[in-house]
């Protein structure tokens, strides 16, 4: 099944939470919080402004984003847990993550 969001909605896949702390302590599943970081899978065409013109979204598929703890609606599409949220629920785009992983 292919899903295409409408208006200013965005489909997000949560990124896995860290298994260990910086000090090397392993975090058990029961103590983990849901991650507030994700990857944009699909975006809608945008919302309409007062003049009726479609305003494109700032995020695009593949962007790594940060969102609020209670943002979005959890759905299951093709057996995968995803979130559908409005663009306004997104706090920002995380840039430069590839270089961060290389340095670690």
UniProtKB/Swiss-Prot annotation:
Keyword Repeat assigned: no
Principal location class: cytoplasm
GO biological process, one term: chaperone cofactor-dependent protein refolding
An example Gene Ontology molecular-function term: metal ion binding
Pfam families found in the cross-reference section: Cpn10
Localization of this protein: Cytoplasm
This protein's UniProt keywords: Chaperone, Cytoplasm
Database matches in CDD domains: cpn10 (cd00320)
Keyword 4Fe-4S found: no
PROSITE patterns to which the protein is assigned, alphabetical: CHAPERONINS_CPN10
Classification via Gene3D superfamilies: GroES chaperonin
GO cellular component, one term: cytoplasm
Family that this chain belongs to: Belongs to the GroES chaperonin family.
Functional note: Together with the chaperonin GroEL, plays an essential role in assisting protein folding. The GroEL-GroES system forms a nano-cage that allows encapsulation of the non-native substrate proteins and provides a physical environment optimized to promote and accelerate protein folding. GroES binds to the apical surface of the GroEL ring, thereby capping the opening of the GroEL channel.
Protein name: Co-chaperonin GroES
Source organism of this protein record: Acidiphilium cryptum (strain JF-5)
Classification of source organism: Bacteria, Pseudomonadati, Pseudomonadota, Alphaproteobacteria, Acetobacterales
Gene: groES
């Amino acid at each position: 099944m292919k899903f295409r969001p409408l208006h200013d909605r965005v489909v997000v896949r949560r990124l896995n939470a860290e298994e260990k702390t910086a000090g090397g302590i392993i975090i058990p599943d029961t103590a983990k919080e849901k991650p507030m970081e994700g990857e944009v899978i699909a975006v809608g065409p945008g919302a309409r402004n007062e003049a009726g013109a479609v305003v494109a979204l700032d995020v695009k598929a593949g962007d790594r984003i940060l969102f609020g703890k209670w943002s979005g609606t959890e759905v299951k599409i093709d057996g995968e847990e995803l979130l559908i949220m409005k663009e306004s629920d997104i706090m920002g785009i995380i840039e430069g993550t590839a270089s961060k992983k290389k340095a670690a």
